Amino acid sequence: MMLPQWLLLLFLLFFFLFLLTRGSLSPTKYNLLELKESCIRNQDCETGCCQRAPDNCESHCAEKGSEGSLCQTQVFFGQYRACPCLRNLTCIYSKNEKWLSIAYGRCQKIGRQKLAKKMFF
């Protein structure tokens, strides 16, 4: 007994739609990882920060930096070594840092006037 072609095509279409939506191996925007869960890249986490532990090779979802905490804006293989700052803070680097070295800064709150000065001068 042979299935009609249109029924076979319909079955294949539903099968591929299932694979594209629910059969996905990476988390979707509705299936993001929570804090302290193991992650592979920043996009997997709710916070947007997948941080690699300095003492081992494990990485986990971490909170973004609060005022005074260590921060970094460079991404290494889809992960941070220190999470970037929260939305209302800026990562400020020391002036004596080398350009090519791995630079860590501190999260600080900056007034709008200082930002405007930095942008134009």
Swiss-Prot record:
The keyword Disulfide bond applies. Exclusively expressed in epididymis, in the corpus region. Disulfide bonds join C39-C50, C45-C61, C49-C83, C71-C91, C85-C107. One of its GO terms (biological process) is digestion. The keyword Signal applies. It is found in: Secreted. GO terms for cellular component: extracellular region. It comes from the Eukaryota. Residues 1-23 form the signal peptide. GO terms for molecular function: enzyme activator activity. InterPro entries: Colipase. Keywords: Disulfide bond, Secreted, Signal. Belongs to the colipase family. This is Colipase-like protein 1. The lineage of its organism: Eukaryota, Metazoa, Chordata, Craniata, Vertebrata. The gene is CLPSL1.
